[in-house]
Amino acid sequence: MFKCKNFNYAVFGNPINHSKSPEIHSLFSKQTGISHFYKSCNVPLNSLYAVLQDFFKKDGRGANITAPFKQEAYFFCNKLTKRAEVAQSVNTLKKIDNCNILGDNTDGIGLLSDLIRLNFIKKNYSILIIGAGGAARGVLFPLLSYGCSICIFNRTVLNAEKLVLQFHKYGNINVFNTNSLHVKSFDLIINATSHFIQDKDNFIPFSCVSSKTCFYDMNYQTDNTFFFDWSRKTGSNFFSNGIGMLVFQAAHSFFLWHNVLPEIDYIIDLLNK
């Protein structure tokens, strides 16, 4: 049976080789002086439950969950934070005792924290989110709670409609319709897809953006991406990748486990080099 052992904290996903989480948590450990043995584990598909059970039965104290397991991890937990319960998606687990695993979702607070750091967001901002998958699901509740209005653009409209139905009680959220042009340009556009939509004939009209629109890619590649190239064509100079979100969500996971929130900014600068 697949096993992870000899450490207390881990990130589970498939694939996982690209993960920067072990590096980030190593920096947190050195900074805070908290012993924090953290590794990455590639989990075979359909094996998450068995892997997590084995991990927590041994020395496991906390775990991060990445694609494609966040919604599956939600059902593994028997206690949930409010934001995890609303998102129905979990990226952080904490062992409370031998019988209870707490599930949290720090993706949304991670994104919101980075947007505030960048001065990319204000209350009442109009936000367009590209994508209606797990990445979008995890961030909607904090953005709506902050007071922003959200439109979701997704090629499969039904998936966007499902998210709107799930989250409409928490704020102003709608499906973006390219046939009904937005009168006012968006203040912020967030790419929540792993592969940015490249079909120019089936995308967002430039009438919906301005030179003041901010662009945020939840992916954290430092090289130019299609989303980056598209944002530049709008005339905007406000663009960021998702490195800051990655570090902030990791910091909030660390806080859940140790009740200490690490310093953030220098780690973001380090990873962006």
From Swiss-Prot:
Shikimate binds at S19, K20, S21, T66, N91, D107, Y220. Pfam families: SDH_C, Shikimate_DH, Shikimate_dh_N. It catalyses: shikimate + NADP(+) = 3-dehydroshikimate + NADPH + H(+). The active site is at K70 (proton acceptor). The keyword NADP applies. GO terms for molecular function: NADP binding; shikimate 3-dehydrogenase (NADP+) activity. The keyword Amino-acid biosynthesis applies. Its EC number is 1.1.1.25. Keywords: Amino-acid biosynthesis, Aromatic amino acid biosynthesis, NADP, Oxidoreductase. NADP(+) binds at G131, A132, G133, G134, A135, M218, G242. One of its GO terms (cellular component) is cytosol. It comes from the Bacteria. Belongs to the shikimate dehydrogenase family. Involved in the biosynthesis of the chorismate, which leads to the biosynthesis of aromatic amino acids. Catalyzes the reversible NADPH linked reduction of 3-dehydroshikimate (DHSA) to yield shikimate (SA). Homodimer. This is Shikimate dehydrogenase (NADP(+)). The lineage of its organism: Bacteria, Pseudomonadati, Pseudomonadota, Gammaproteobacteria, Enterobacterales.
